[in-house]
């Protein structure tokens, strides 16, 4: 019986109790726009599609704690069925639903032929995020992250 209780405690901690986000802050759409422009993620042939007028952001450290808890990256990749765009949509939706952070964008990168996320933080510049393997990416790091043509939906 003790082993079952221990296993349930681990399950509760790992899958039910989400990390606390003590740094959640409200920002307006113009602040988000300036962050994206300053970081070079929008402009030219990369357009932003606005979703909200108010956004909630957190520190990168708190967001990293969320990523360690989230299991989107554990999904199985199935070409043309559950692929890059599905991972990116799912991760964005989970951030909205589970932790109330809506400053996670969906990037449709036509130049790279890929879809992924972009996260705006309260304490550091926005960064690109690959939800398939929980990794941070730099613009231009590889041919999949060129972001010279496409959309940032945020």
Language-model regions, residue ranges each:
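A structural boundary/capping signal
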Residues: 1-154
């Amino acid at each position: 019986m003790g082993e079952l209780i221990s296993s349930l405690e681990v399950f509760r901690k790992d899958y039910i109790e989400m990390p606390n986000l003590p740094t959640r802050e409200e920002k307006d759409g113009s602040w988000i726009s300036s962050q994206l422009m300053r970081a070079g993620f929008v402009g030219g042939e990369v357009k932003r599609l606005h979703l909200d007028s108010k956004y909630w952001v957190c520190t990168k450290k708190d967001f990293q704690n969320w990523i360690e808890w989230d299991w989107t990256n554990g999904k199985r990749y199935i070409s043309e069925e559950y692929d890059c765009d599905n991972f990116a949509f799912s991760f964005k939706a989970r951030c909205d639903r589970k932790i109330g952070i809506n400053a996670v964008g969906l990037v449709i990168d036509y130049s790279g032929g890929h879809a992924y996320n972009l996260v705006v933080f309260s304490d550091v510049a926005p960064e690109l995020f690959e939800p398939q393997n929980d990794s941070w990416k730099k613009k231009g790091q590889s041919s999949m992250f060129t972001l010279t043509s496409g959309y940032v939906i945020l």
